[in-house]
A protein has these predicted regions:
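Charged (often Lys/Glu-rich) extended helix/loop segments that serve as interaction or gating elements
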Residues: 3, 253-400
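General structural feature for long, well-ordered alpha-helical segments within catalytic domains
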Residues: 5, 21-24, 28, 32, ...
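Active-site-proximal loop/turn and secondary-structure-junction residues that shape catalytic pockets
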Residues: 24, 48-52, 73-74, 94-96, ...
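Conserved, mostly hydrophobic/aromatic
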Residues: 25, 49, 71, 103, ...
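Structured core elements
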Residues: 66, 89, 111, 131-133, ...
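Glycine-rich, aromatic-flanked loop segments that form ligand/cofactor-binding clefts
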Residues: 127-139
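Active-site loop/helix belt of alpha/beta enzymes
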Residues: 136-277, 339
């Protein structure tokens, strides 16, 4: 997106502000289609937890993408947005069984990741189809906070319990039709993907009614020029090879599901702030902006890198600075970066803000959440209003 368009959006709608370029989402989807074109039968499901604005979800749905939901609320939002129920996969973690029952009543597919929840499911829905999330015992991903497939992770059925599942399936106490794996996010080493792919296809041979394998997400995008990324063609080739082996060994053809979140929407998003003050100290040049981790949590939570552009002065000499928020915490958004000279009132844009940006925002310090805009068909459209004080108070009950 051009700097001129982003600056115009900030001037017209105020800051802080999230802006999404929907054409980039479609472009990312086309990359996946091209990479997976040799797979016999596959489906892309979007991870709703990364960005759940209904306008964005409807745009994604119109691309004929399915939905990965991790809460009953995401399931309901998906249905409201028009996703077909059989193309919504509900993958909860540690939820009360009442939530699973509600999802079942709504007609979506269920993917469970604990023996206890699977036993409850089999008692309530004998021999109904179910998908199961496996923990492959693989450490993969950009850092420990986004690595979720290792042996100490809370996610998935550990390998030592796989035989219990196979026995339950053989005894017709459960009807396993799908297997799911997700090892982590920002995976660049294809051998880490390959380990999980080989393992899940091997396990799949043990289940008599298996129909699908869900390989989760984890595809890494570059966050700055020269940054590493997942080699999509190598990844697709590894999937094809294991699927072909499976077909040759079993005579069955499986549906392969992928669940990208960040890959589809991260690059489409821009988070724009305004500079309140510049505060110099002995060792730092602090740029204080009108936002913080209440709006943009990833840099603080994950130490994630987001390139910053000075929209007001993009081509001046670069100076080292640290961008901090207005929250009464240590909310550093970018540390010791070289950015075009910044002045009070300048507009700063954080790139790759489409995933886990607004969705992880909060009202901490009683701050209002920002508006969301999208760029579609060469026009800027508001897709969420900025909150007001009434929004903060509307669910509170004054007892005095």
């Amino acid at each position: 997106m051009k700097i001129k368009e982003l600056k115009k959006a900030a001037v017209n709608f105020g800051t802080p502000l999230y802006v999404y370029d929907l054409s980039i989402i479609e472009s990312q989807y086309r990359k996946l289609q091209n990479a997976f074109k040799n797979l016999d039968n596959y489906k892309i499901h979007f991870a709703a937890k990364s960005l759940s604005n209904i306008s964005v979800l409807k745009f994604i749905k119109n691309l004929e993408i399915g939905l990965d939901a991790v809460s009953i609320e995401e399931v309901k939002i998906g249905i409201k947005c028009g996703f077909k129920k059989h193309e919504i996969l509900f993958t909860p973690n540690g939820v009360n069984f009442s939530e699973i029952k509600e999802a079942k009543s709504l007609g979506v597919k269920i993917n469970l990741d604990s023996l206890e929840s699977i036993k409850d499911f089999s008692e309530n829905y004998p021999n109904d189809p179910i998908s199961i999330r496996i923990n492959p015992g693989i450490y993969a991903g950009g850092n420990e906070k986004i690595s979720v497939g290792h042996s100490n992770s809370k996610f998935g059925i550990p390998e030592e319990f796989i035989n219990d599942l196979i026995k339950m399936d053989e005894d017709n106490r459960i009807n396993v039709t799908g297997l799911h794996i997700h090892t982590g996010s920002d995976i660049t080493k294809n051998n880490e993907f390959e380990k999980g792919i080989k393992k899940i296809f091997s396990i799949a041979t043990k289940f008599k009614n298996i129909e699908s394998i869900d390989l989760g997400g984890g595809i890494k995008i570059p966050y700055f020029s020269g940054d590493t990324e997942t080699n999509l063609n190598d990844y697709a080739k590894a999937v094809e090879e294991e699927h072909n082996k499976f077909k040759n060994n079993t005579g069955k053809k499986l549906k392969i599901i992928f669940e990208p979140g960040k890959f589809l929407v991260s690059d489409s998003g821009y988070f724009i702030t305004s500079v309140n003050y510049i505060k110099k100290s002995q060792n730092n040049n602090f740029i204080q902006v009108n936002s913080g981790f209440n709006h943009f949590l990833r840099p603080t939570l994950y130490n994630s890198y987001h390139e910053v552009i000075n929209l007001s002065n993009p081509n001046d000499q670069k100076e080292e600075c640290t961008i901090v928020g207005y929250i009464c915490e240590k909310d550093t958004l970018a540390e010791k970066r070289m950015i075009s000279k910044i002045s009070k009132g300048d507009l700063l844009c954080f790139k790759n803000a489409g995933a886990y940006g607004y969705n992880m925002s909060s009202n901490y310090n009683s701050r209002l959440r920002p508006a969301e805009l999208c760029i579609h068909d060469n026009s800027i459209k508001k897709i969420r209003e900025k909150e007001n004080l009434e929004d903060l108070l509307k669910n509170q009950i004054d007892i005095f």
